[in-house]
Amino acid sequence: MTLRPSLLPLRLLLLLLLLLRGAVCQAEAGSETESPVRTLQVETLVEPPEPCAEPATFGDTLHIHYSGSLVDGRIFDTSLTRDPLVIELGQKQVIPGLEQSLLDMCVGEKRRVIIPSHLAYGKRGFPPSIPADAELHFDVELIALIRANYWQKLVKGILPLVGMAMVPALLGLIGYHLYRKASSPKISKNKLKEEKRNKSKKK
């Protein structure tokens, strides 16, 4: 059986379209699997050993063990070979994504965290261990938690506001002093000399 000459171009075109569609589908599937995460992802690996009455919140001091790795599995930092890391939540002592993942965590709990680059080191990276735009993976365990009391939280919350309020006041005082200095009448040198002469004559 032979194909009509008029049907050959049509069948070749259909075959090319099918091949092209398959290639596009494979490319889309590959891009979906390789695309970086856009939001913080938190997975609980180990639940706290007992009901958690005091989950971590801003102002608390946390003792954590962690291991940080890149997408390819290379570990760039770990605390497992040293003492736990001590941080105070809300003081920006670690990258934003890691700090956010520690909120509501309980002692004894272990989490796996996937942090997008904009919540880690962003475009600048942290050479040489962390490249630019790197997605980071952390395994974190909360070893101990020291609860901040009411007065500690109050002081830490008010002091920044007081500092912000004092800046305009100080600027206003400086501006007022400069204005008074500029608007005060200036005495010429000749007039000063005359006043000195008059004082000396009176003596």
From Swiss-Prot:
Annotated signal sequence range: 1-29
Transmembrane segments: 158-178
Location relative to the cell: Membrane
SUPFAM superfamilies: FKBP-like (SSF54534)
Source species, domain of life: Eukaryota
EC number: 5.2.1.8
Keyword field contains Isomerase: yes
One Pfam family from the record: FKBP_C
Molecular function in Gene Ontology: peptidyl-prolyl cis-trans isomerase activity
Main subcellular localisation: membrane
First-level EC class: isomerase
A cellular-component GO term for this protein: membrane
Keywords: Isomerase, Membrane, Rotamase, Signal, Transmembrane, Transmembrane helix
Any single GO BP term: chaperone-mediated protein folding
Keyword Protease: no
Reaction(s) catalysed (UniProt annotation): [protein]-peptidylproline (omega=180) = [protein]-peptidylproline (omega=0)
InterPro entries: FKBP2/11, PPIase_dom_sf, PPIase_FKBP_dom
Topology class, membrane: Single-pass membrane protein
Residues covered by the PPIase FKBP-type domain: 59-146
Family in the record: Belongs to the FKBP-type PPIase family.
Function comment: PPIases accelerate the folding of proteins during protein synthesis.
Summary of subunit composition and partner proteins: Interacts with IFITM5.
Name the record gives this protein: Peptidyl-prolyl cis-trans isomerase FKBP11
Organism: Bos taurus (Bovine)
